[in-house]
């Protein structure tokens, strides 16, 4: 949730953020109205309770003759207090609903527009110039015994797969390398639960416009996570953190689940867009004033991993209309996929400022010992989709694939052969 104090002082900035996202700026006015109504209801209730307290003292000091009339007045006042409390509760519920309808305030400098309006910040590496017709990742994966989509579909349905043999080792090696790099940079490794309570899923912002992307176990009222960002954000919910020595950094290794409800007909071939995949995700809690610098650090660590797998990629500044509701700014790294003649997302890092932490009640103490809302950030360090870029960019004319040098110790071979 956004900071209501910021909203009251900067309503035009929040309206502009809504426009940048392509969302309704009128929601800002609805929130301001709900905020004013709730504050008025609280004031009215407080005044009545103060009056009730003073009236109670008057009753206690009254003579026997005066008391019956005063008691009758006390009953009337009690009824008014009860009504005021009901109105306050109703006003709070309306405020909560209006508050949750507003996405995070887009950071100044982020591009306006939608999915195609990103700004390319840098392009890294040389696009391979093959002297043969390159195969796509699925053809390579099947011919080398790395990917089995047919049996994945037989067992689980469309967009499921088996990683087999060195395909499994390639993923495990990639994730293990990511875990080692995370630990070397001060992250605490975590294997989190992949089922979370509704309040944790909602707190991270995943039950808004894209709620249909999330798997829900209705009988247990639990959600399957699409990223370990969710349980890691909930890890310190309701706590006051000690950030005096700098950010708290966690790296979660988990299986992730996405319904891909809005992706019918898109990327139906191979493992680019699937219902289940594995990922190592970086997650940071820090002071708000440290968030921008931390965002750049997360991006730098992602780039280190992409350098390790030796694929050409570009870094983009994602436009406001393509941001998730929790993100104020997002940078993606997209790798070149030769057979698509296009760049495809491999990593994403988001600065969620205080949006998630405010929902989840994560705070820290400032230099005066006063609790303040923390900032949260996240970023991909490795995920299943990377196999696509590795296979296609490192394929050779004889149908084999060269294993990136950094992954050889984990995979156990330097060339993937039939």
From Swiss-Prot:
ATP binds at residues 258-260, 274, 345-348. GO terms for biological process: selenocysteine biosynthetic process; seryl-tRNA aminoacylation. It is an enzyme of class 6 (ligase). It is found in: Cytoplasm. L-serine binds at residues 227-229, 281, 380. GO terms for molecular function: ATP binding; serine-tRNA ligase activity. Its EC number is 6.1.1.11. Pathway: Aminoacyl-tRNA biosynthesis; selenocysteinyl-tRNA(Sec) biosynthesis; L-seryl-tRNA(Sec) from L-serine and tRNA(Sec): step 1/1. The lineage of its organism: Bacteria, Bacillati, Actinomycetota, Actinomycetes, Mycobacteriales. InterPro entries: aa-tRNA-synt_IIb, aa-tRNA-synth_II, aa-tRNA-synth_II/BPL/LPL, Ser-tRNA-ligase_type_1, Ser-tRNA-synth_1_N, SerRS_1_N_sf, SerRS_core, tRNA-bd_arm. Consists of two distinct domains, a catalytic core and a N-terminal extension that is involved in tRNA binding. Disulfide bonds: none annotated. It catalyses: tRNA(Ser) + L-serine + ATP = L-seryl-tRNA(Ser) + AMP + diphosphate + H(+); tRNA(Sec) + L-serine + ATP = L-seryl-tRNA(Sec) + AMP + diphosphate + H(+). This is Serine--tRNA ligase.
């Amino acid at each position: 949730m956004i900071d209501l104090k910021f909203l009251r002082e900067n309503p035009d900035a929040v309206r502009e953020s809504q426009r940048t996202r392509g969302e309704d700026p009128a929601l800002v006015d609805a929130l301001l109205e709900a905020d004013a109504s709730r504050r008025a209801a609280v004031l009215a209730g407080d005044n009545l309770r103060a009056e009730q307290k003073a009236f109670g003292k008057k009753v206690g000091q009254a003579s026997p003759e005066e008391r019956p009339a005063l008691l009758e007045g006390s009953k009337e006042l009690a009824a008014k207090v009860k009504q005021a409390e009901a109105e306050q509760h109703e006003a709070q519920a309306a405020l909560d609903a209006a508050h949750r309808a507003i996405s995070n305030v887009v950071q100044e400098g982020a591009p306006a527009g939608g999915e195609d309006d990103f700004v390319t910040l840098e392009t890294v590496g040389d696009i391979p110039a093959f002297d043969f017709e390159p195969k796509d990742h699925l053809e390579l994966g099947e011919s080398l015994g790395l990917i089995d989509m047919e049996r994945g579909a037989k067992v689980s349905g469309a967009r499921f797969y088996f990683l087999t043999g060195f395909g499994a080792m390639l993923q495990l090696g990639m994730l293990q390398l990511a875990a080692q790099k995370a630990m070397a940079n001060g992250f605490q490794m975590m294997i989190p639960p992949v089922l979370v309570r509704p309040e944790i899923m909602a707190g991270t912002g995943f039950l808004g416009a894209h709620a249909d992307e999330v798997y829900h176990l209705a009988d247990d009222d639990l959600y399957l996570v699409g990223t370990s960002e969710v349980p890691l954000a909930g890890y310190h919910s309701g706590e006051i953190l000690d950030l005096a020595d700098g950010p708290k950094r966690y790296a979660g290794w988990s299986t992730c689940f996405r319904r891909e409800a809005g992706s019918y007909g898109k990327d139906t071939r191979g493992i680019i867009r699937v219902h289940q995949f594995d990922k190592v995700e970086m997650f940071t809690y820090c002071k708000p004033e440290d968030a921008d610098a931390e965002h750049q650090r997360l991006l730098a660590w992602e780039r280190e991993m992409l350098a390790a797998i030796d694929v050409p990629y570009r870094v983009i500044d994602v436009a406001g209309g393509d941001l998730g509701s929790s993100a104020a700014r997002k940078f993606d790294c997209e790798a070149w996929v030769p057979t698509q003649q296009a760049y495809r997302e491999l990593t994403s890092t988001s600065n969620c400022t205080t949006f998630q932490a405010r929902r989840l009640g994560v705070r820290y103490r400032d230099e005066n010992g006063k609790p303040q809302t923390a900032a949260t950030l996240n970023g991909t360090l490795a995920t299943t989709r990377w196999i696509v870029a590795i296979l296609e960019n490192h394929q050779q004319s004889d149908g084999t694939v060269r294993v990136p040098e950094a992954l050889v110790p984990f995979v156990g071979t330097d060339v993937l052969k039939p």
